[in-house]
């Protein structure tokens, strides 16, 4: 595995044995450390590269469709004048702290605009979270005859952010049950058990809200939706996060109906940041089986 593991104590193994070295890595070519090429006596280029696009063509992986979800609040920040009374109240403690740090007298009024890169540090906005969840539940790829959103990972900013996402989901969709959307990070005691359940098609959760833990190294072929709800700065991590949805999955929608693609909802401008494109998501116009049966009963009643 020719990236991070070739350095430190593991490097001694390669120095000790006089043999042919074959290095394999999923790290994007532009991000591979020069020392890796030096170790393998290469001139900053790999001997062979098998791209994601080639793997899609050869039907080893599945492509994604992309929706760049515009959130003025996330991308451009928050203007004080645009805040509701409730949202201003949420920021009062922040402003009180800043007044103390800046030596501003307590009796003096103080507030300021919040920049886009401060959003998740200072404010978890329910309206934004609700929009993210509504977009997923409305336009995400579905299973079980349209009754359920397919297995989904929501990449959250931090533990508090992830907690609020789960709380809002349970308030908006109580009929789905408490296990439908669950938080997975290292602060959750039974996170290994939840991950094991998430990997099983017939078990809940259907939606995993992850803080770093599911960004890399997890293989769940049933994943149909990825929600990028945090800002990503690492190209390596970004590519690996996309990889969570690329696995093949046979008979996912029924006998002979295999997974053909997956959806990505990007709320934080990550695909623009990394100059990555994708075909547009198809807006959902299909009704679930329950909805179709209800409409049929109405027609019969008429």
Q: PLM features: residue spans?
A:
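Conserved H-loop
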Residues: 26-27, 212
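Amphipathic alpha-helical transducer elements in NTP-driven molecular machines
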Residues: 4-7, 49, 126-130, 207, ...
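Conserved RecA-like P-loop NTPase helicase motor core
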Residues: 176-285
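Long, largely alpha-helical accessory region at the distal end of helicase-like NTP-driven motors
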Residues: 112-124, 131, 268-302
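Conserved C-terminal RecA-like helicase domain
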Residues: 98-210
């Amino acid at each position: 595995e020719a990236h991070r593991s070739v350095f430190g104590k593991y490097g001694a193994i390669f120095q000790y044995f006089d043999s042919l070295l074959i290095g394999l890595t999923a790290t994007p070519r532009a991000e591979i450390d020069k020392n890796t090429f030096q170790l393998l006596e290469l001139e900053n280029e790999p001997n062979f590269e098998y791209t994601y696009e080639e793997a899609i063509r050869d039907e080893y992986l599945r492509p994604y469709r992309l929706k760049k979800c515009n959130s003025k609040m996330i991308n451009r920040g928050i203007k004080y004048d645009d805040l509701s009374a409730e949202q201003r109240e949420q920021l009062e403690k922040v402003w009180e702290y800043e007044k103390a740090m800046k030596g501003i007298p307590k009796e003096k009024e103080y507030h300021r605009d919040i920049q886009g890169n401060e959003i998740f540090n200072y404010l978890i906005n329910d309206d934004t979270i609700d929009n993210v969840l509504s977009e997923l539940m409305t336009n995400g790829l579905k299973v079980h005859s349209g009754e359920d959103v397919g297995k989904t990972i929501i990449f959250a900013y931090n533990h508090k952010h992830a907690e609020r996402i789960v709380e809002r989901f349970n308030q908006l969709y109580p009929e789905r049950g408490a296990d439908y959307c669950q938080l997975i990070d290292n602060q959750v005691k039974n996170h290994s058990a939840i991950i094991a359940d998430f990997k099983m098609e017939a078990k809940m959760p259907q939606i995993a809200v992850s803080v770093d833990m599911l960004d890399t190294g997890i293989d769940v072929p049933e994943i149909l939706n990825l929600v990028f709800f945090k800002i990503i700065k690492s190209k390596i991590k970004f590519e690996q996060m996309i990889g969570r949805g690329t696995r093949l999955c046979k008979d996912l929608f029924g006998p002979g109906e295999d997974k053909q693609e997956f959806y990505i909802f990007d709320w934080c401008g990550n695909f623009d940041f990394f100059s990555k494109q994708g075909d547009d998501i198809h807006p959902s116009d299909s009704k679930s089986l329950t909805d179709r049966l209800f409409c049929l009963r109405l027609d019969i009643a008429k």
